[in-house]
């Protein structure tokens, strides 16, 4: 059986000005394709490797064609296409209208189409490549897919992280069981680890580079480079020199997990008073502080010996090292 995994915009270019203007950073980025043949992973490629466009989010036609050619396959040889939908409103609408499913079946005439949730894709990627038989899994980033309407507002909710348990058993069912979800509601989603780091990185980067004439990272699509650069800048600052409201407050315990609520501070105004190096250090400290708080309070009945991290926030190697140091 040939299974093709796809992530990327279908039916639009992934970066329509209307979407950028209305939704800010909610554009499709990092598209790519993966092939599994008879249960074995054969290829996994990002579109930007071929297009040479950083964070390319368009339909990954070059990646797909390379995979097909490499394995001597045609579009008709694909039995199943698994599509990971994004959290943009337009992709959500296209999925709901069955446009995406019909388009994929047009591209791959003999395939069935299934949709895979954003955070489940992250969770599977980290767990199934870990070698662990059993593990806690935390997938966390700015936001995931739209999931279901809020009882209060009727608006569709997006999770900014999911906590799961992975178990590699002989059974094919329930290998990854989601046990806790934190929803960030709708934009601007300030109670999201990833979104807060992203917003604060943008403010800090702009302060740091305001007098730099040749700034190579000014385009909308390049702003996803900011968090990594600010993480590196943190080593040069002192978080204790920054007196700002905490990112989160611990409002209550829900399902025996700490529930973190954003303080909704307007950091865009407050940041201007501080050195950007110190701001970077403060941001990193806040990220580590509340991530470690959450991971340290996993209920005992759910706690496993191993931990897998997935999603954009899992790229924060400084926080990852703290997790290892504290034996979480």
Annotated model-derived regions:
Residues 1-328:
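Short acidic/glycine-rich loops and adjacent helix/strand connectors
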């Amino acid at each position: 059986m040939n299974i093709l995994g796809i992530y990327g915009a279908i039916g639009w270019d992934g970066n329509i000005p209307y979407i950028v203007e209305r939704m800010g950073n909610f554009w499709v980025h990092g598209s790519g394709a993966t092939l599994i043949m008879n249960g074995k992973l054969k290829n996994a490629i990002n579109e930007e490797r071929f297009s040479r466009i950083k964070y390319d989010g368009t339909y990954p036609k070059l990646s797909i064609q390379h995979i097909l050619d490499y394995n001597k396959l045609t579009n008709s040889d694909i039995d199943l296409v698994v599509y990971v939908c994004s959290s943009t409103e337009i992709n959500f609408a296209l999925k709901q209208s069955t446009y995406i499913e019909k388009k994929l079946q047009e591209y791959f005439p003999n395939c069935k189409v299934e949709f895979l949730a954003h955070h489940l894709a992250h969770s599977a990627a980290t767990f199934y490549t870990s070698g662990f038989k059993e593990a806690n899994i935390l997938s966390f980033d700015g936001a995931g897919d739209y999931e279901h309407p809020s009882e209060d507002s009727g608006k569709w909710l997006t999770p900014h992280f999911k906590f799961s348990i992975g178990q590699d058993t002989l059974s094919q069912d329930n290998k990854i069981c989601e046990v806790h979800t934190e929803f960030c509601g709708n934009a601007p989603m300030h109670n999201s680890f990833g979104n807060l780091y992203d917003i604060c990185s943008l403010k800090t980067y702009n302060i740091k580079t305001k007098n730099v004439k040749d700034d190579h990272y000014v385009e909308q699509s390049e702003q996803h480079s900011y968090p990594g650069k600010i993480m590196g800048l943190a080593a040069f600052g002192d978080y204790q020199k920054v007196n700002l409201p905490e990112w989160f407050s611990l409002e209550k315990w829900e399902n025996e997990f700490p529930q973190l609520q954003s303080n909704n501070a307007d950091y865009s105004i407050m940041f201007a008073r501080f050195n950007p190096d110190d701001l970077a250090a403060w941001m990193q400290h806040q990220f580590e502080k509340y991530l470690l708080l959450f991971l340290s309070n996993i209920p005992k009945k759910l706690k496993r010996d191993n931990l897998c991290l997935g999603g954009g926030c899992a790229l924060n190697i400084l926080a990852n090292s703290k997790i290892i140091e504290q034996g979480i």
